[in-house]
Amino acid sequence: MRKVNLIIMLGVFLTCTSTAKASYEDEMELRTMSKIEAQESGYSLGVTKEDIDLMAAIAEAEAGNQGLMGKRLVVDVILNRVDSDYFPGEIEKVIYQPNQFTCISDGGFEKAISNISDESYAAVYDELLERTDHDILFFTAGNYGQYGIPVYQYQDHFFCR
């Protein structure tokens, strides 16, 4: 594992989630007012507003009907791939890597990017603050895919490491 230093600007969060429930927004304000440091061993991962938008759009397109946890797990896959030696080390490159996310090729991503829910943004911020699962690298809908070792099913998605 690597050390991840994240700086999340409060203004970016509030801009992205202006209609979020006040209690959640208040909690996030407290959690993002200063530098967030996640201890994992060795490098800094700079997360831009564009990265956050991309991850939220993927979460929306791939797990729009899977609830907050389903979206968080999709974001985990992206972040875990960034950390993996087997995938590109940047969020945008992971997302646009050929044949990885169905929504990129079927038009779902383009539809989602203009209509990202507050819940999808919350999933991204929650995972940046505290990952749900550090091991999952793949997911498919309907059954376990041909890649990776099956780990578990969450609603309609099957996750592998």
Functional labels for PLM-detected ranges:
Residues C16-S34:
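Sec-dependent signal peptide cleavage junction
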